[in-house]
């Protein structure tokens, strides 16, 4: 009887931790040949949200664009990628400094994997006492790795002062990161570090510069379908 009571008490004490656990990452079917979206999950304000991140398979290895929201999933994602593609992760590019993007770069730094972030992102990471990247992103410059190409671009402030997007010219796909809201979003989400005055101007720059994009991936929630950029402007106009 005492054993049963003790088990009951322990179960009650542990229940908040169980409820705080989030779902494991999900790798979506490839959207374009070697280009993949993977979704991770995190809790903000007591509600679970999904984050859309990407990876590119090259002949030299896999390039991650942002990291899982939960650090506990870093190794598992790398193992899954290695098993699925028979290639290691060779580089990580962070689109801004938050946990669902840059996360803890020390994990990758310690494994000898090159990590990339802008000088501004590194400034924020350092200010928060977090590891900075081993390499500085040169925005607007094409990166060519193992037969694949992409460009990391800074168009202006929006969700944060350091948010960048990633353009894949071979596939006409733009990773909008948290600068772009999903067509299913009901609000702008976390805006304590946002520049809501500059954000619409930045989005209009994105529309003009990447008008050839056939797919634009928002940072969170549903990524399929279109209208993400237009919906972002609608949400900003309500602010």
Curated annotation (Swiss-Prot):
InterPro entries: Beta-lactamase_class-B_CS, Metallo-B-lactamas, NDM-1-like, RibonucZ/Hydroxyglut_hydro
Assembly, per entry: Monomer.
SUPFAM superfamilies listed in its UniProt record: Metallo-hydrolase/oxidoreductase (SSF56281)
CDD domains: IND_MBL-B1
Residues bound to a beta-lactam: 181
Species: Chryseobacterium indologenes (Flavobacterium indologenes)
Signal sequence, renumbered to the chain: 1-20
Predominant location category: periplasm
Subcellular location per the Swiss-Prot or TrEMBL entry: Periplasm
Cofactor note: Binds 2 Zn(2+) ions per subunit.
Gene: IND-1
Keyword Iron-sulfur among UniProt keywords: no
Function, as annotated: Class B beta-lactamase which confers resistance to the beta-lactam antibiotics, including penicillins, cephalosporins and carbapenems. Acts via hydrolysis of the beta-lactam ring. Has penicillin-, cephalosporin- and carbapenem-hydrolyzing activities.
CC per GO annotation: periplasmic space
PROSITE patterns: BETA_LACTAMASE_B_2
Co-factor requirement: Zn(2+)
PANTHER family per UniProt: ACYL-COENZYME A THIOESTERASE MBLAC2 (PTHR42951:SF4), METALLO-BETA-LACTAMASE DOMAIN-CONTAINING (PTHR42951)
Protein name: Metallo-beta-lactamase IND-1
Keywords of the record: Antibiotic resistance, Hydrolase, Metal-binding, Periplasm, Signal, Zinc
């Amino acid at each position: 009887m005492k054993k049963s009571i003790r088990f009951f008490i322990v179960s009650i004490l542990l229940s908040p931790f169980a409820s705080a656990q989030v779902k494991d990452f999900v790798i979506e079917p490839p959207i374009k040949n070697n280009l993949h979206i993977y979704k991770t999950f995190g809790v903000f304000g007591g509600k679970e949200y999904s984050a859309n991140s990407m990876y590119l398979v090259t002949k030299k290895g896999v390039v991650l664009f942002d990291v899982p929201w939960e650090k506990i999933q870093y190794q598992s994602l790398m193992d899954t990628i290695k098993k699925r593609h028979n290639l290691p992760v060779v580089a990580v590019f962070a689109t801004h400094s938050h946990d669902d993007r840059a996360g803890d770069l020390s994990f990758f730094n310690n494994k000898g994997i090159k990590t990339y972030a802008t000088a501004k992102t590194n400034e924020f990471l350092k200010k928060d006492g977090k590891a900075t990247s081993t390499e500085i992103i040169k925005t607007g410059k094409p990166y060519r790795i193992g037969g694949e190409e992409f460009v990391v671009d800074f168009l202006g402030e929006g969700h944060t002062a350091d948010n960048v997007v990633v353009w894949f010219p071979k596939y006409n796909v733009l990773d909008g990161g948290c600068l772009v809201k999903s067509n299913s979003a009901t609000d702008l989400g976390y805006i304590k570090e946002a520049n809501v005055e500059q954000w619409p101007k930045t989005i209009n720059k994105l529309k003009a510069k990447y008008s050839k994009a056939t797919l634009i991936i928002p940072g969170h929630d549903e990524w399929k379908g279109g209208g993400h950029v237009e919906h972002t402007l609608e949400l900003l106009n309500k602010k």
